[in-house]
Amino acid sequence: MKKLFGTDGVRGVANVYPMTTEMAMQIGRAAAYLFKDGNRRHRIVIGKDTRLSGYMLENALVAGICSMGVDVLVVGPLPTPGIANITSSMRADAGVVISASHNPFQDNGIKFFSRDGFKLPDEMELKIEDLIFSGKIDSLRPVATEVGKAYRIDDAVGRYVVFLKNSFPKDLDLAGMKIVLDCANGAAYKVAPAVLEELGAEVIPYGVKPNGTNINAGCGSLYPQVISEAVKEHRADLGIALDGDADRVIFVDEFGNEVDGDHIMAICATQMLKQKKLRKNTLVATVMSNMGLDIAVKRAGGKVVKTAVGDRYVVEEMIKGGYNLGGEQSGHMIFLDPNTTGDGVLSALQVLATMRRADKSLSELAEVMIPLPQVLVNVRVKEKKDITTIPEVALLIGDIEKKLGDEGRILIRYSGTEPLLRIMLEGQDKYQITGWAKEIADLVEKKIGGK
């Protein structure tokens, strides 16, 4: 059982345990020890998003890592996938991201990438925790010239912009395309506009003035209504919204209608099937994806493999099965041929390339998938108790599942990063499943709800 790490690294309110400077330094020391192999100089990349607390945690991590005799390459604000890319391209021993993704500014987090740019498996995170709580490394104190150094990589943004542009087909450009872009006042506020503009698009930017406290504040992928209204106002071709660390992306079409991750996966999977580029004709998605995605991919000659929720589990399944496309309904998209993790800007470029190649609007491409009605309700809880051990709740869920039969499903799971129970229902009748979802939520609230 992990004590610090959740589904996406260590996360919490900044300056409150476990997201304190003291713990960040300990995490840095443990990680530096773990990633050292052989008698040579080692290097770890550190990047962050635009949160105020990023400075505090960055310095603590740098101090911890250097105190173990490992050098640090500091890249500053950069999208999470950009940090993974820089880690791999600079042949560093590991990468560290300081970000809480789509969470509000007061939260922050720490997560790691291995030297090849992939997120760490659970066993590596457990080893970091063991080194911290066992005290095994407390007495290890390199001295004199063995202490690590910190270097700032000033051209990290430029390096990543070049990488992203190189992922776009050389025979295509975005000339004549008007794009509304919301960077959530987050890590992509420089990168994303630069990439789209250099490829020829007219960019109408939102969320590109971070001040440390406005990341994800009424903007970004959690607030698609912002780009929806802007697309209609500016008569743009589409809208693109990233989250705070730019590892996920949500679109709206030319009419302002949201196009979620499931639709994007359907668009990309069917296009790759046509081009015979989808490995093993298989798309990897999570259990949260709409059943309409399975139907669309099957109709195009492919299949969908499902995993637990979390882009790390999608990537693990992709590596294990030898697949090259995966993602989540929330907007995490993983293209393993050019990248190693979810990348909002790269995913947007893949969709834009498909639009250009097919000479179709986003609304036309999105017609490839017809989603089943789906309802998602979040209930804040005081404890993450196994739902099957609450008789009344388990009985109610069982009764509703019988009524749904083969024409729908219920998925109940706890958030890996927040004290929330997520209740998702899918079925043919939106009104009916909305009522059932509320019925379950009300009962859960009564039994284990928390303010």
UniProtKB/Swiss-Prot annotation:
Biological process annotations from GO: carbohydrate metabolic process; peptidoglycan biosynthetic process; UDP-N-acetylglucosamine biosynthetic process
Cofactor note: Binds 1 Mg(2+) ion per subunit.
Pfam family, one: PGM_PMM_IV
Annotated GO MF terms: magnesium ion binding; phosphoglucosamine mutase activity; phosphomannomutase activity
Group of enzyme by EC: isomerase
Active-site positions on this chain: S101 (phosphoserine intermediate)
Catalytic activity: alpha-D-glucosamine 1-phosphate = D-glucosamine 6-phosphate
Modified residues (Phosphoserine): S101
Record CDD domains: GlmM
PROSITE patterns xrefs: PGM_PMM
EC number of this enzyme: 5.4.2.10
Cofactor: Mg(2+)
One GO CC term on file: cytosol
Record's comment on post-translational modification: Activated by phosphorylation.
Keywords: Isomerase, Magnesium, Metal-binding, Phosphoprotein
Residues involved in Mg(2+) binding: S101, D243, D245, D247
Family that this chain belongs to: Belongs to the phosphohexose mutase family.
Its job: Catalyzes the conversion of glucosamine-6-phosphate to glucosamine-1-phosphate.
Name by which UniProt lists this protein: Phosphoglucosamine mutase
